[in-house]
Swiss-Prot record:
Organism: Ectopseudomonas mendocina (strain ymp) (Pseudomonas mendocina)
Superkingdom assignment: Bacteria
Protein name: Bifunctional protein FolD 2
Enzyme Commission numbers on file: 1.5.1.5, 3.5.4.9
UniProt GO cellular component terms: cytosol
Protein's pathway: One-carbon metabolism; tetrahydrofolate interconversion
Catalytic reaction equation(s): (6R)-5,10-methylene-5,6,7,8-tetrahydrofolate + NADP(+) = (6R)-5,10-methenyltetrahydrofolate + NADPH; (6R)-5,10-methenyltetrahydrofolate + H2O = (6R)-10-formyltetrahydrofolate + H(+)
Residues noted as binding NADP(+) in the record, renumbered to the chain: 169-171, 194, 235
PANTHER family: C-1-TETRAHYDROFOLATE SYNTHASE, CYTOPLASMIC, C-1-TETRAHYDROFOLATE SYNTHASE, CYTOPLASMIC-RELATED
Family classification: Belongs to the tetrahydrofolate dehydrogenase/cyclohydrolase family.
Subunit annotation: Homodimer.
Gene Ontology molecular function, alphabetical: methenyltetrahydrofolate cyclohydrolase activity; methylenetetrahydrofolate dehydrogenase (NADP+) activity
The protein's role, per its UniProt record: Catalyzes the oxidation of 5,10-methylenetetrahydrofolate to 5,10-methenyltetrahydrofolate and then the hydrolysis of 5,10-methenyltetrahydrofolate to 10-formyltetrahydrofolate.
Amino acid sequence: MSAVLSPKLIDGKAAAARVLAEVTEDVRTLKAAGIKPALAVVLVGDDPASQVYVRNKVLRAEECGIRSLEHKLPADTAEADLLALIHSLNADYSVHGILVQLPLPAHIDETRVLQAINPLKDVDGFHAENVGGLSQGRDVLTPCTPAGCLRLLQDSCGDLTGKHAVVIGRSNIVGKPMAALLLKAHCSVSVVHSKSANLRELCRQADIVVAAVGKPRLVDADWLKPGAVVIDVGINRIDEGGRSRLVGDVDFDSALTRAAAITPVPGGVGPMTIAFLMKNTLVAARLQHPATGLPLSTLENPA
């Protein structure tokens, strides 16, 4: 079933629901074999947005049948204490995935913390071993947002072989892993950013545009060739007419006149990020129990 509605709107909520259904089915398969997938979520401090994100992740895990373990630490937690918790979770065979909610308080070294997570339990896909493996085209735990974007593209376009993709943005969380995933899918990939010359002209050549640069409504119809497929990763809060609203990096109404398919903001990429966190937790559990040999739909659909 395609994730494209009308023929233009890519429905991220519907696609995410399908991914979560796959995960739920595979959780049952693993549980029948005595494996109970578990995700540990670590939150340091009381940032309201982070609390909402953690709550949503825990809720989705429970809906899929994944056991969730919340570790809420005060904002003044010492880095050494946080690292000690991570080492404890690494050693706990009943925990298959570890997620440390970002951002961390300023006194904690984010890189040191993320690199302390066992790569096989790194469900965010941020560990250097997973980043390097992805760049080499290996099957590793992959950052959730770009993995979700790839699934939307595959649902919308089918085989991506030979397509020219332009990724706007070079972040370690989205831009770089997105480019690596598209290369693995046999696309020709260009990575552009705010310092790129002829940015608009480069985008006009693309069959696929992934916008992940954090600039509200940067990309409009004039940036697109007719029939392009557009994935908008941007989430920008702006004030418009005295009201606060969320918009993407793409001028949606303008781009809709030229794109063959496009994700909305909200309701496009966002739901896929949490869905792929659940999928990564499932895959992590499977990777930590390779002897089972169980066929799982989440492994048959790796993106």
